[in-house]
Amino acid sequence: LAQYVYPRYFSIDAGEVVAMDMWLTNARLNGTHQEGLWDIDVRSEQINGRLKWMEGAGNTADGKLVARLKSLNILQSSMKKVSDMTGREDIYRIPSLDIVTDDLTLFGKHLGRTEIVANNVSFKNGREWRINRLKITNPDAALESSGSWVTTAGNRQQTRLSYVLNIKDAGKLLARFGYEDIIRRGRGEMKGDISWDGLPFALDIPSLSGKLSLRVETGQFLKADPGAAKLLSVISLQSLPRRLNLDFRDIFSKGFAFDEITANAGIANGIMRTENLKMNGVNATVMMDGSVDIRQESQDLHVVVIPEINAAAASIAYGFINPAIGIGTFLAQMFLREPLMKQFTHEYHVTGSWSDPVIVEVKAGTGK
């Protein structure tokens, strides 16, 4: 009977067709099926390229999909079918993948060239969909990542990723994701490890945990709507000029230009903590420590602003890159070497929500 169910050669030309759980429009498929290997050429609005499906020995997880695509457009609606699988026994039965796409569009965002190599691995109490390589490249950045999606007994799921993001233009990268006019230029690197409960494509903020390090050079925060990229509006300190009559208010209200931003941070259950975020600019040096609650969109930060520091103080500020050195240690060193700098140093305690922060100036050198 199998030879009647599975054709050796086929050609499909249809306005709409469902293939591999994806709804394809204006589709043309030509392919062959021989000895467990499907070889298909696909032309549609969603997929354009060559697919090879190697059947497994009894279940989907044993199979392998190899694809070389000119373009792939994944819509948000197409993910609903995957989400609906989360309560089913075969959630972890995803095949091995070897996919290269010249132009990936994900949920309306153009990501660029994408490569993914992954395979399904079983262990005593569950299964792991292991991401051996995930690489995304476009003119603005290059991401290299690896990790896993683990399902254990009781259908508990967790996604884990290690990543390195090489940033060529931070402003254009943010614009690619819909956050325009937030930053101008900016080159650098962000790397770290993150994990969250649930599916790889459904970031769960309450369980988000991990660590990151950041270094970005030569850019400028623009005067942007705080509603866009809210977390960046916290870091850029655009709320300070609106609430305090500062001598250096123009530094932030017109957009802080920076030579370098460095930071190390840890994330636990959606709360990010740092002891050494530093921004060096021509007109000021800014340092922060404290926590940001990504879940509640709130913060508890100690902020230090040193406008137009002199050469001696600048040498100390530029040396403030050691993750082991906190703001308190830096200020103690600076005030010891340059006592007059205490008069020009402004410290603030910033709490409340991202959209309506509470800012209180504190005595320099005390943090309170």
Explain the meaning of each model-derived region.
Residues 122-123:
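Short, compositionally biased segments
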